[in-house]
Amino acid sequence: MRGLPMGLSIRGLTRTFPGQGRAAPTLALQPTDLDVAPGEFVSILGPSGCGKSTLLRIVAGLDRPTGGHVTLNGRQVTRPGPDRGMVFQSYTLFPWLTVRQNIAFGLRERGLPEAQIRETTEKFIARTGLRGFEEHWPRQLSGGMQQRTALARALANDPEILLLDEPFGALDHQTRELMQELLLEVWGADTPETRKTVLFVTHDIDEAVFLANRVLVMSARPGRVKAEVPVPLPYPRDWTVKTTPDFAALKARLMAEIREEVRKAALA
């Protein structure tokens, strides 16, 4: 792949949804360019309906752009693939499989040796704090434990990029903060050279700043990246970073950016 861009590269990406009946088509994404380096953790922040999830679904290969293209490590994205792992806000575990079986599902579908499946599954059960819950069914789990399992399942497949679409949005505040810390702990367990690339969609400014080393702010629909804010807070991070002046300053800057777009969305 000599000469090809590494990491995630988005160029001229647009998405228009056809209108229903006589309604006009809806432009969800204006031409969008974006680069995410290998191992980078990027949060995407924006008002409801701005195209955040649409952008993520196109990167995942779950939706097709109207224009432009996406490449991951030099390969054009046209369909879903094991090089991209996704975790949704809604609970997406297979209800007929146990925690262990859910985590192992993708590995087994790829036909990997049973010894490798067991080793990898156990590794991510341990990393995500699921010891003692391996044989539970999804209906027996809290929302937080279901999302731990979904995260473990995505990571077990060893994707090149992890795509998270408001994965903690349905959780209570305390559980949400614990899951944020868990995600950073799992992500930071690898060396800087081998860390997963992460694209994380959220409505929550605190969450965006706490997790990422860069936050992108999207405009009201039709969406585009209107601002890019580096987050120079050192890793590893825990909840105490939220009490610092640097965190407050970043939050205030993002609040100013996002309030303008939320106001536009409300008046649209």
Protein language model regions, located:
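Conserved ABC transporter NBD signature motif
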Residues: 68-80
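Conserved ABC ATPase "signature" region
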Residues: 108, 113-133, 184-185
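Helix-to-loop junction immediately C-terminal to a conserved catalytic motif
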Residues: 60
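Conserved signature/switch motifs of ABC ATPase nucleotide-binding domains
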Residues: 136-139, 157
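The feature captures the beta-strand-to-loop junction immediately N-terminal to the Walker
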Residues: 45-47
